[in-house]
C-alpha cells in the first residue's frame, strides 16, 4: 500500500498511530497498551472486536455479504529487546527495546 492508495485525511492519523505504537513498545505477551489501543481503533471503525485472544491478541471482525467467504490479516505487535539507535521524534520511550 502506498500513500496514494490511502484517503488523504487518514494519512496524518495513520502516521500518528504508527509513531505512537513505536514510541511505546511492549515485549511479547505484555502488549496491554498496544492491544487496548488497537481494539479501540477497530471499534471506532465499526468492527466487532474480541480481545484477550491468546493473552493480548485482538481480533476485529468485519461482516459483509452472506458470510460464505472470509479474509484474515495478521500482524505482530510485540517489540524486540534491541536498543534503538538514532533520535527520531517517535523514538521508543524505553530505549532497551523497540519495534
Language model features by range: what are they?
Residues 1-23, 81:
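N-terminal hydrophobic or amphipathic helices/low-complexity stretches enriched
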Residues 16-20, 88-95:
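A short small-residue
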Residues 17, 24, 28, 41-45, ...:
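Generic N-terminal helix/loop capping motif
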Residues 21, 60, 73:
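Divalent metal-coordination and catalytic microenvironments
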Residues 27-67:
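A non-catalytic alpha/beta surface segment that caps or lines the substrate-entry region
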Residues 69-71:
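Structural motif
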Residues 74, 78-92:
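Acidic-glycine-rich active-site phosphate/pyrophosphate-binding loop
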Residues 98-99:
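Conserved small/polar residues in nucleotide/adenosyl-binding loops
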Amino acid at each position: 500500500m502506498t500513500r496514494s492508495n490511502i484517503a488523504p485525511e487518514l494519512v496524518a492519523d495513520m502516521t500518528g498511530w504508527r509513531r505512537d505504537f513505536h514510541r511505546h513498545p511492549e515485549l511479547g505477551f505484555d502488549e496491554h497498551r498496544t492491544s487496548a489501543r488497537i481494539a479501540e481503533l477497530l471499534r471506532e471503525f465499526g468492527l466487532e472486536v474480541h480481545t484477550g485472544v491468546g493473552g493480548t491478541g485482538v481480533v476485529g471482525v468485519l461482516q459483509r455479504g452472506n458470510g460464505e467467504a472470509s479474509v484474515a490479516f495478521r500482524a505482530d505487535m510485540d517489540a524486540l529487546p534491541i536498543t534503538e539507535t538514532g533520535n527520531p521524534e517517535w523514538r521508543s520511550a524505553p530505549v532497551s527495546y523497540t519495534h
